[in-house]
């Protein structure tokens, strides 16, 4: 009896017992409720296959997808003071930084790299939204400035992929200082004659929208991205009136002249390459003639 109780029963229980399933094994589409296996979602560039809804894409995956063969040089993360204000709300800021670093395996919200897109050298800067909402703090601001300096020094274009809730409140005025700093960095690149293209992703809001995210020579946007300064609910409460359907979406901003093109994620590398070749006066291939007219129009606008 002891043999059955002590050996056989535990073995059966272990075989039939419930196994732990990772929380992110299946991803639910916010738009349609469709459940997608996470590997299928990653393989489709974080776009829901049936609905075409663009999920937030990790910064590392974004850079690997953008550059030819996924090859690029990562720019080093600048060292800045950690938690200079000793800020605490419901949680210590230092603890938030630690947790975000464990979650994303990044030092801060910005990842930057140098590589080639269809043979054209450029610097790309990407926000990681899962790092404290992609917020702009001292480390992020310094990383952005360094990326612009690198692009200026190497005389190559810079492409920005913002995804942010705005300035990082835990750093107070030190965070707000990054708005003029990054704006000056944009001007520095433009004075050197190099193109600056912004690909607006979901969401792009707050102080990021009020600075470098809306200073590009050309603005692309992913479908359905929320783009604005204050949130829709805040504006409605302030104005005490209902805002139009689709307000602050990529498509709404395209209709009202705030962005130049809405581009699906799968088409972004090709579109960027063609735009940059036009802007830098390099030969453009005859392929994809259907898109060339729209791209040339955007470049001349």
From Swiss-Prot:
GO terms for molecular function: acetyl-CoA carboxylase activity; ATP binding; carboxyl- or carbamoyltransferase activity. Keywords: ATP-binding, Cytoplasm, Fatty acid biosynthesis, Fatty acid metabolism, Lipid biosynthesis, Lipid metabolism, Nucleotide-binding, Transferase. It is found in: Cytoplasm. GO terms for biological process: fatty acid biosynthetic process; malonyl-CoA biosynthetic process. Its EC number is 2.1.3.15. Residues 25-294 form the CoA carboxyltransferase N-terminal domain. SUPFAM superfamilies: ClpP/crotonase (SSF52096). Pathway: Lipid metabolism; malonyl-CoA biosynthesis; malonyl-CoA from acetyl-CoA: step 1/1. It comes from the Bacteria. It catalyses: N(6)-carboxybiotinyl-L-lysyl-[protein] + acetyl-CoA = N(6)-biotinyl-L-lysyl-[protein] + malonyl-CoA. GO terms for cellular component: acetate CoA-transferase complex. Pfam families: Carboxyl_trans. NCBIfam families: accD. PANTHER family: ACETYL-COENZYME A CARBOXYLASE CARBOXYL TRANSFERASE SUBUNIT BETA, CHLOROPLASTIC (PTHR42995:SF5). Component of the acetyl coenzyme A carboxylase (ACC) complex. Biotin carboxylase (BC) catalyzes the carboxylation of biotin on its carrier protein (BCCP) and then the CO(2) group is transferred by the transcarboxylase to acetyl-CoA to form malonyl-CoA. Belongs to the AccD/PCCB family. Acetyl-CoA carboxylase is a heterohexamer composed of biotin carboxyl carrier protein (AccB), biotin carboxylase (AccC) and two subunits each of ACCase subunit alpha (AccA) and ACCase subunit beta (AccD). This is Acetyl-coenzyme A carboxylase carboxyl transferase subunit beta. It comes from Rhizobium leguminosarum bv. trifolii (strain WSM1325).
């Amino acid at each position: 009896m002891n043999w059955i109780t002590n050996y056989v029963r535990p073995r059966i229980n272990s075989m039939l017992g419930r196994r732990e399933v990772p929380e992110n094994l299946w991803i639910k589409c916010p738009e349609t409720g469709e459940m997608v296996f996470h590997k299928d979602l990653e393989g489709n560039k974080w776009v829901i296959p049936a609905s075409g809804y663009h999920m937030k894409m990790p910064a590392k995956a974004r850079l690997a997808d953008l550059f030819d063969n996924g090859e690029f040089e990562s720019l080093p993360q600048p060292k800045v003071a950690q938690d200079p204000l000793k800020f605490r709300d419901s949680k210590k800021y230092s603890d938030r930084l630690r947790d975000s670093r464990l979650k994303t395996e990044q030092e801060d919200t910005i990842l930057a790299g140098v590589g080639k897109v269809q043979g054209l050298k450029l610097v790309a800067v990407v926000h990681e939204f899962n790092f404290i909402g992609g917020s702009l703090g001292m480390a992020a601001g310094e990383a952005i400035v360094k990326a612009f300096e690198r692009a200026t020094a190497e005389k190559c274009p810079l492409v920005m992929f913002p995804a942010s809730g705005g300035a990082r409140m835990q750093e107070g005025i030190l965070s707000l200082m990054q708005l003029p700093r990054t704006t000056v960095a944009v001007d520095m690149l433009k004075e050197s004659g190099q193109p600056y293209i912004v690909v607006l992703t979901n969401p792009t809001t707050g102080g990021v929208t009020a600075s470098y995210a809306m200073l590009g020579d050309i603005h692309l946007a992913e479908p359905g991205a929320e783009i604005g300064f204050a949130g829709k609910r805040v504006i409605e409460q302030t104005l005490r009136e209902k805002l139009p359907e689709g307000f602050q979406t990529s498509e709404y901003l395209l209709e009202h002249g705030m962005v130049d093109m809405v581009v699906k994620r799968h088409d972004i590398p090709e579109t960027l390459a063609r735009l940059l070749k036009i802007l830098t006066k390099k030969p453009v291939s005859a392929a994809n003639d259907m898109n060339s007219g729209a791209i040339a129009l955007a470049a001349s606008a």
